[in-house]
Amino acid sequence: GFEDGDAKKGARIFKTRCAQCHTLGAGEPNKVGPNLHGLFGRKSGTVEGFSYTDANKKAGQVWEEETFLEYLENPKKYIPGTKMAFGGLKKEKDRNDLVTYLREETK
């Protein structure tokens, strides 16, 4: 389950594994993937102006630390039909670090 991780390590993971497709700040544009500002507490498939698959829209998943931690392990298993081309982060420590970073940076 989710435990507070190392946000600095999470930042490095974001930079190398996520930043090519996602932005974090309020008002920053969607890229290949949606802007992640306000991620926690938001329902999947609801970022304005982003073209989601039906699977993401229908999933109705509310993103919290625990649900996002699970999603990051294997996105295509968690939401079959997602177009996120990311194989997942297998190490729970890496996922905890990334979620800890995202929780701060997407507020």
From Swiss-Prot:
SUPFAM superfamilies membership: Cytochrome c
Family indicated by similarity: Belongs to the cytochrome c family.
Subcellular location(s) of the protein: Mitochondrion intermembrane space
GO molecular function annotations of the record: electron transfer activity; heme binding; metal ion binding
Chief localisation class: mitochondrion
Annotated TM spans: none
Record's protein name: Cytochrome c
UniProt PTM: Binds 1 heme c group covalently per subunit.
UniProt: heme c binding residues: C18, C21, H22, M84
Function comment: Electron carrier protein. The oxidized form of the cytochrome c heme group can accept an electron from the heme group of the cytochrome c1 subunit of cytochrome reductase. Cytochrome c then transfers this electron to the cytochrome oxidase complex, the final protein carrier in the mitochondrial electron-transport chain.
Originating species: Ustilago sphaerogena (Smut fungus)
PANTHER family tied to this protein: CYTOCHROME C
GO cellular component, one term: mitochondrial intermembrane space
Alphabetically ordered keywords of this record: Electron transport, Heme, Iron, Metal-binding, Methylation, Mitochondrion, Respiratory chain, Transport
